[in-house]
Amino acid sequence: MNFPLFTGCATALITPFLPDGRLDEPALRRLLAMQTAAKMDALVLLGTTGEPCTLSMDERERIIEIGLECTGGSIPVIVGTGSNDTRRAIEYARQAQRLGAAGQLSVTPYYNKTTQSGLIRHYHAILDACPLPMILYNVPGRTGMGLSADTAAALSRHPSVVGLKEASGNSTLTGEILEKTRRELPIYCGNDDQILPMMAQGSCGAISVVSNILPDKTRALTRACLERRMDDAQALQLELMPLIRALFLQVSPIPVKAALAMMGLIHDELRLPLVQMDEPYRSRLKQALLDARLLS
């Protein structure tokens, strides 16, 4: 049995920047305070939502340090360590372990795609070099390749593999993974619009974008699912759907950073090649925030 790092809801936190492009440490601390106040079950730093591909090793270190300082050990802090260079992924994993992270989230290699056997060798190489507990991350829409159910089952036998963030949007694949791993590999929903159906199917939680905006309600949705209060879960999922749709009008994290800026929590700054949200999408996002009573 692979024991999960958490059950419930983890926020895939954004990385705030100043207008001059530097890391906005005060804003990061505000966001972390908002998450801890909502009693989130875990936090993911430097995941896709955190723009890790445009951060230096020093910036990564500072973000992890602040995350661990602000949470004070109250919840697991999981660090995104994925790379399409296995050697770099090992460096990221060792950094996260050295600083005290509870675990790592490792996306399948992108662009220079590999085979399923290559995926197994990639992940085993990382874990042989650094056994920091790992949540695998399957998001073929971004990486261009997917993790098969057989590969997930093979990797689940490694003692340091403690979960899978499944963001393919393929419920059949989720079912196959649950079947082939005998439900012993914890699976986390990686798509906010599918939290209820995936948790009803057997997932143990979610790694969420919308929880950057509404951490309390997103966590309440996952708790309702875990406690099998499906009427409550359905109501919460439906309540969140308009905002979820708005947060994916353009490529994430562009909309979620625009939303947080409208709420006065951060500057609306991203690092190229990401750019600020276009019209008419920005107006639609603002209306969704108004409808959710997050703006006045």
Write out the residue ranges for each language-model feature:
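A general structural signal for well-ordered alpha-helical segments in protein cores
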Residues: L28, R60, I64, A89, ...
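Short secondary-structure transition/capping segments
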Residues: L55-D58, E91, Q116-L119, L147-A149, ...
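C-terminal alpha-helical cap/extension of soluble enzyme domains
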Residues: L5-T15, M34, A38-M40, T49, ...
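Active-site beta->alpha loop and helix N-cap motifs at the rims of alpha/beta catalytic domains
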Residues: F3-T11, P16-G144
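Alpha-helical structural signal in soluble globular domains
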Residues: A38, R62, I66-T71, Q95, ...
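Charged, low-complexity surface patches
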Residues: D24, D85, I187, L249, ...
